[in-house]
């Protein structure tokens, strides 16, 4: 019996020693804490609907160094409250509309390295993914509040300045397409639009960073045709959801697509983002071109074949060209930026091109006017 008691006492002593060693190895915290985070989101764009700004799922992660200390989500909310964590220096990472993305247990470096791809679901505008850059905070024991008005008491962080999350996507759209042939063509040609395409669109972008554009050279197109032009990507996939039948665009019914951030760098295989309208070149009265007229138009590079009057009017979005003008003194950047709207007014002044993925000549028969804003609107005017 005594041997048994001594044996149990020995086990208890060993257990206490082990516990003490474990406690010594753990980081010392100032006490238990909670953090509540409230968001500031961009105003919705009425033309595309409330879905552009909808936060279907909001996720907040708390990091102690590289390690995830807490993660909590809320459905259909712009705040996540009472996230249980520990006091001390911490990093907050906030994301919205992450869908089935697995975030639990990821290190801070792993989260910062996350990417996303352009999908058909993005084009419905519902639940566009949003992120905020990681922010460092000092949490105290008790209740902490980020972005609140101060009435809650506790430790107020960034009082009255909620954390702002921004859409990862941008939107490019025609808000007007009009045919206004120049004197040289007004009595010869007209144009009958049939389709609108995102002709060249980046497939992937980062989710965090000063720029979300990455060096991945994969692109998507809504067109079935391979053009092999100077702007044609080497890595190119057709998806039918980046093309649609023509509907006359307006400010209240823009016609376009959601796209990802991208940068143009020809030598690196990175291409401009192109929005394009496709249709038929016709006689000035809308009747079909004659065989002779089609042959002449084909030889001029305006239509795709001497028996096919299909023509294209491409617009390189947020691009510098003498054919493009921008509203409000905006300077084009030759790239797509997250959380921007690129609203494009296209004026067609003559025949189009049979290769919309080649550079546009300064004498092209198009004018582009673009308005840029964050959820910023960029107004671009294009004249062909």
Swiss-Prot record:
Stretches for region Important for oligomerization and fimbrium assembly: 375-384
Domain of life, per lineage: Bacteria
Family from the record: Belongs to the bacteroidetes fimbrillin superfamily. FimA/Mfa1 family.
Secretion signal span: 1-18
Miscellaneous notes: The name (major fimbrium subunit) does not indicate the abundance of the protein, but is derived from the greater length of the major fimbriae. In strain ATCC 33277 and strain 381, major fimbriae are 300 - 1600 nM in length and about 5 nm in diameter. In contrast, minor fimbriae are only about 80 - 120 nm long. This length difference is observed only in a small number of strains, including strain ATCC 33277 and strain 381, and is due to a loss of function mutation in FimB, a protein that restricts fimbrial length in other strains.
Assigned GO CC terms: cell outer membrane; pilus
Record protein name field: Major fimbrium subunit FimA type-2
Lipidation (S-diacylglycerol cysteine): 19
Protein role: Structural subunit of the major fimbriae. These long, filamentous pili are attached to the cell surface; they mediate biofilm formation, adhesion onto host cells and onto other bacteria that are part of the oral microbiome. They play an important role in the invasion of periodontal tissues. Fimbriae and their constituents are major virulence factors. FimA proteins from different strains have highly divergent sequences, and this has been used for classification. The sequence-based classification correlates with pathogenicity.
Keywords per UniProt: Cell adhesion, Cell outer membrane, Fimbrium, Lipoprotein, Membrane, Palmitate, Signal, Virulence
GO MF annotation list: structural molecule activity
InterPro entries registered for this protein in UniProt: FimA_C, FimA_N, Fimbrillin
Protein location: Fimbrium; Cell outer membrane
Coiled coil stretches, renumbered: none
Subunit structure: Fimbriae are composed of a major, structural subunit (FimA) and the minor components FimC, FimD and FimE. Head-to-tail oligomerization of FimA molecules mediates assembly of the fimbrium stalk, while the minor components probably form the fimbrium tip. Linear, head-to-tail oligomerization of FimA is mediated by a conformation change, facilitating the insertion of a C-terminal beta-strand into a groove in the N-terminal domain of the following subunit.
This protein's record includes keyword Signal: yes
One Pfam family cited in the UniProt record for this chain: P_gingi_FimA
Site (Cleavage): 46-47
Residue numbers with lipid attached (N-palmitoyl cysteine): 19
PTM section of the record: Synthesized as palmitoylated lipoprotein precursor. Efficient export to the outer membrane and integration into fimbriae requires lipidation and subsequent proteolytic removal of the lipidated propeptide.
């Amino acid at each position: 019996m005594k041997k048994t008691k001594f044996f149990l006492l020995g086990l208890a002593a060993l257990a206490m020693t082990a516990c003490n060693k474990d406690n010594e190895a753990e980081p010392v915290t100032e006490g238990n804490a909670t953090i509540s985070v409230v968001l500031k989101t961009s105003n919705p764009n009425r033309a595309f609907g409330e879905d552009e700004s909808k936060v279907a799922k909001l996720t907040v992660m708390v990091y102690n160094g590289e390690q995830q200390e807490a993660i909590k989500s809320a459905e259909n909310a712009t705040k996540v409250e009472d996230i249980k964590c520990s006091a001390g220096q911490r990093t907050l990472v906030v994301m919205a509309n992450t869908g089935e993305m697995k975030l639990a247990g990821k290190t801070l470096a792993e989260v910062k390295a996350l990417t996303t791809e352009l999908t058909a679901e993005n084009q419905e505008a519902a639940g566009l993914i949003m992120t905020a850059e990681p922010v460092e905070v000092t949490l105290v024991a008790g209740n902490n509040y980020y972005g609140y008005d101060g009435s809650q008491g506790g430790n107020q962080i960034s009082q009255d300045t909620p954390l702002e999350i921004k859409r990862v996507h941008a939107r490019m759209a025609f808000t007007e397409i009009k045919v206004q042939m120049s004197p040289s063509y007004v009595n010869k040609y007209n144009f009958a639009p049939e389709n609108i395409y995102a002709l060249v669109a980046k497939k992937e972008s980062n989710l965090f960073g000063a720029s979300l554009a990455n060096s991945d050279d994969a692109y998507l197109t809504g067109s079935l045709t391979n053009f092999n032009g100077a702007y044609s990507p080497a890595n190119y996939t057709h998806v039918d959801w980046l093309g649609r039948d023509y509907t006359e665009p307006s400010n209240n019914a823009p016609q376009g697509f959601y796209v990802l951030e991208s940068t143009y760098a020809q030598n690196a295989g990175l291409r401009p983002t192109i929005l394009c309208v496709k249709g038929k070149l016709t006689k000035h009265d809308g009747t079909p071109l004659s065989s002779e007229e089609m042959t002449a138009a084909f030889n001029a590079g305006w239509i795709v074949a001497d028996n096919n009057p299909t023509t294209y009017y491409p617009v390189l979005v947020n691009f510098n060209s003498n054919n493009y003008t921008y509203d409000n003194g905006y300077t084009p950047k030759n790239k797509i930026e997250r959380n921007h709207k690129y609203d494009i007014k296209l004026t067609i002044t003559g025949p189009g091109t049979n290769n919309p993925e080649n550079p546009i000549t300064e004498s092209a028969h198009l004018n582009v006017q673009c308005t840029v804003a964050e959820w910023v609107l960029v107004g671009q005017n294009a004249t062909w």
